[in-house]
Amino acid sequence: MIRNGHGAASAAGLKGPGDQRIVRVWCDGCYDMVHYGHSNQLRQARAMGDYLIVGVHTDEEIAKHKGPPVFTQEERYKMVQAIKWVDEVVPAAPYVTTLETLDKHNCDFCVHGNDITLTVDGRDTYEEVKQAGRYRECKRTQGVSTTDLVGRMLLVTKAHHSSQEMSSEYREYADSFGKPPHPTPAGDTLSSEVSSQCPGGQSPWTGVSQFLQTSQKIIQFASGKEPQPGETVIYVAGAFDLFHIGHVDFLQEVHKLAKRPYVIAGLHFDQEVNRYKGKNYPIMNLHERTLSVLACRYVSEVVIGAPYSVTAELLNHFKVDLVCHGKTEIVPDRDGSDPYQEPKRRGIFYQIDSGSDLTTDLIVQRIIKNRLEYEARNQKKEAKELAFLEATKQQEAPPGGEID
């Protein structure tokens, strides 16, 4: 177990002075390529109770039921631990959620999104807890999925960037990525009821939908806490694209620089990131990157669309005490100047070595190297989902009749 230190009372199952029992909530999953959709699910789950425990599956279990994960289990444990709504992480959680697991961790119920998770033989992994009435559902976040992110990496296009329309080429690729050659594993046609819910023979759970950023979503993710007297304001800036372990390790080290840190992360505009990263970077647009970083427990505030050069105006406005950068290359601004010139002049610039070598480039390389495996994984996953949906509809059909 990996506890995140939210208080001994919570871990013990007590609320405090009145010794009132707290509600302990269980979530589990692969949490591979963690994005703001995962974070939003955990945020919703935490709101249903007082203490959130998250079980993460092993590489072996994921490979057996879904296909090879992008990240190792140790990387995935650490990513989930860094999400601010998580109180405790349970490594090597079983793929099928049972009452035994909930009882072992003293959890009242488990929470999952309104999509389906199936075993290798097509069974609902939450069937047992659903039948026992210890299952709760939260809304799946529209507009983001591992499928979509992998598709963006494999197809070199900038259509996902802010203020740009999705190109027909990207839409065609996104719609077909992971789509099985036949609607069902046996190649059978889908019933009219299922077909109406699954246009083009695609699962409603695996695929791409449009992400619509709202102010409410940002408010839900933000802490809303201003810097307090005695806190050290630390500023970091970058793309923070595909928010990953390398970012978490860096921010964790930054967090250790002060007894009471208040970390502000400045996120550059998509066009600025593309200037210094090239290709089709950033993989995630500014709105998506904002939510990903806001979900991190080591970040207090985010500047959306921060200037590339850290100016005197910015430092004065936020009353910044320290400015930090990792060991990645510092690319000059458009005019050739050092973007950290002002904090260096003030003597408040620190370069941090987090000890992690993982970068967004390396993640993309992992995906490209294993492209065929990931596409096959999605085809297998979607075929199982469609077969499950078809079987469910047939069970719901009136005896001796067709589904209307």
UniProtKB/Swiss-Prot annotation:
Q: Which SUPFAM superfamilies match?
A: Nucleotidylyl transferase
Which sequence positions carry the modification called Phosphothreonine? T359, T360
Highest taxon listed in the record's lineage: Eukaryota
Q: Which reaction does it catalyse?
A: phosphoethanolamine + CTP + H(+) = CDP-ethanolamine + diphosphate
The record's comment on protein family reads: Belongs to the cytidylyltransferase family.
On this chain, the residues bearing Phosphoserine are S356
Described by its record, this protein's role is as follows:
Ethanolamine-phosphate cytidylyltransferase that catalyzes the second step in the synthesis of phosphatidylethanolamine (PE) from ethanolamine via the CDP-ethanolamine pathway. Phosphatidylethanolamine is a dominant inner-leaflet phospholipid in cell membranes, where it plays a role in membrane function by structurally stabilizing membrane-anchored proteins, and participates in important cellular processes such as cell division, cell fusion, blood coagulation, and apoptosis.
Instruction: Please name the PANTHER family in this protein's record.
Output: ETHANOLAMINE-PHOSPHATE CYTIDYLYLTRANSFERASE
Instruction: Tell me if Ribosomal protein is a UniProt keyword of this record.
Output: no
The organism of origin for this protein: Mus musculus (Mouse)
Q: In its UniProt entry, what is this protein called?
A: Ethanolamine-phosphate cytidylyltransferase
The record's GO molecular-function terms, alphabetically, read: ethanolamine-phosphate cytidylyltransferase activity
Q: Where does the record place the region Disordered?
A: 173-201
The biological process GO terms on file are:
phosphatidylethanolamine biosynthetic process
